């Protein structure tokens, strides 16, 4: 009596098993399951990956500004996005830290690590010092400058590679009531004090340095004094200039207010036509830990970090929504 042999799997069944295999979880070494995707056209070595020139959203999603107040904001006309690939190198940075000294920075609303209330100015001073000293340990050729902003702007500390020089000007600062925010004056001062590098080939030749402005800002929503001049257009379109923002807002939306903090946050984001800058918003009545975490995320080199909407700070995808328990700097 013949015993029938077990039938071998057909080619169609093998293909179904291959397609049914679950992809690997998304990790730092395998972002978005990159190794499980079909091999496509690869970007050239040392260039930004596909999609990193897209407009960045603010920390896992920018606020929805569809319900703006009755008064329209004078937002700069939308310029075409400049998608330029640059070498992903750790060249020296010239970091200009702009600290707001409005009276909102002195309100004791932030919750400190021990549960007591503190103000945004004290927290900002500490996180700026930690940022400068950590960046200096990463690369001692980085340079830093401190600018304070109230009704006007003042350049307190020139570009220096010694963190002690900047930190000596960082404390003993006083806040004041501010009626306006002269954003145009701030950028004009930056243009006077710095010079943007120029290379023969942006895609292949690393720049000698990059210029990055970090604005720590906390004011009620108000239309800044700003007009986009031709020199400013060139500055924002330069692939070696970055404008990062940490916006500390009141977190409330009263009906009688014509403008919302979301309008101001969207205005700041509209200045970045390249999609390479990072923008964060933190509630003034929230934990001080959030401010430290935002500043820690800005430690990455702007030429080496991804578009903000692609940035992930967890090992696995399931941890994306987990609450961070400590600031890492």
UniProtKB/Swiss-Prot annotation:
Q: Which residues form the signal peptide?
A: none
- Write down which residues bear the modification named N-acetylmethionine: 1
Q: Where is this region: VWFA-like?
A: 95-298
Query: Please, which domain of life does this record's source organism belong to?
Result: Eukaryota
Kindly state one GO CC term assigned in the UniProt record: nuclear body
Q: Does the keyword Nucleotide-binding apply?
A: no
Q: Where is this region: Disordered?
A: 1-84
As one GO molecular function, the record gives:
identical protein binding
Q: How does it assemble?
A: Component of the ARISC complex, at least composed of UIMC1/RAP80, ABRAXAS1, BRCC3/BRCC36, BABAM2 and BABAM1/NBA1. Component of the BRCA1-A complex, at least composed of BRCA1, BARD1, UIMC1/RAP80, ABRAXAS1, BRCC3/BRCC36, BABAM2 and BABAM1/NBA1. In the BRCA1-A complex, interacts directly with ABRAXAS1 and BABAM2. Component of the BRISC complex, at least composed of ABRAXAS2, BRCC3/BRCC36, BABAM2 and BABAM1/NBA1. Identified in a complex with SHMT2 and the other subunits of the BRISC complex.
* Descriptive protein name: BRISC and BRCA1-A complex member 1
